[in-house]
Regions:
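Conserved aromatic-histidine-acidic binding/catalytic patches
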Residues: 5-8, 53, 121, 125
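Hydrophobic pocket/interface hotspot
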Residues: 20, 32, 65, 102, ...
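A beta-strand edge to alpha-helix "cap/lid" segment located at domain peripheries
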Residues: 83, 90-140
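A solvent-exposed, acidic/Ser-Thr-rich amphipathic alpha-helical stretch
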Residues: 38-105
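Short, low-complexity N-terminal intrinsically disordered segments enriched in polar/charged residues
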Residues: 1-38
Length: 140
């Protein structure tokens, strides 16, 4: 049976994951980065059955990702909002209580505003991406 400390930590981690999803939905990068440690590292990967390997689309630390997010307003981007539906599957606190790992499912929907056929697509909700978050936490 888990002790109360571990359960409390697990609930706090779940809350952080959900706060992160809300911040990302609002494109509030500052609040999202505030949840991340300075040693934060982010990567986007997927498994390719054709080559039987993981493919990396992006990998970088907090400084690199912050720089990219600061440049977003200078680029022509699709302003159709993204909405994340996140479900935390597991939170595993290490035996020493100093770290934890979590796995969450994420489904992202896009509400169309713009596009090639904006007069047809506007207001439509589309499945944008599905995947999993694999998060690591430092517990202080």
């Amino acid at each position: 049976m888990e002790n109360n400390y571990s359960v409390t930590i697990e609930r706090k981690i779940e809350k952080i994951i959900y706060q992160a999803a809300l911040a990302l939905d609002k494109n509030n990068w500052a609040d999202w980065f505030e949840l991340c440690d300075d040693s934060f590292f982010y990567s986007i990967t997927s498994f390719s059955p054709e080559i039987s390997k993981d493919m990396t689309y992006f990998s970088g630390d907090k400084k690199e990702l912050t720089g990219l997010m600061e440049m977003l307003p200078k680029h022509n981007t699709d302003h159709s909002p993204l909405h994340r539906h996140t479900s935390v599957y597991t939170v595993d606190v290490s035996d020493d209580g100093k770290t934890a790992e979590a796995v969450s499912s994420v489904v992202i929907y896009q509400n169309m505003l713009d596009g090639i056929n904006s007069h047809l697509d506007s207001g439509e909700s589309r499945l944008f991406v599905i995947g999993k978050y694999h998060d690591k936490f430092l517990i202080e």
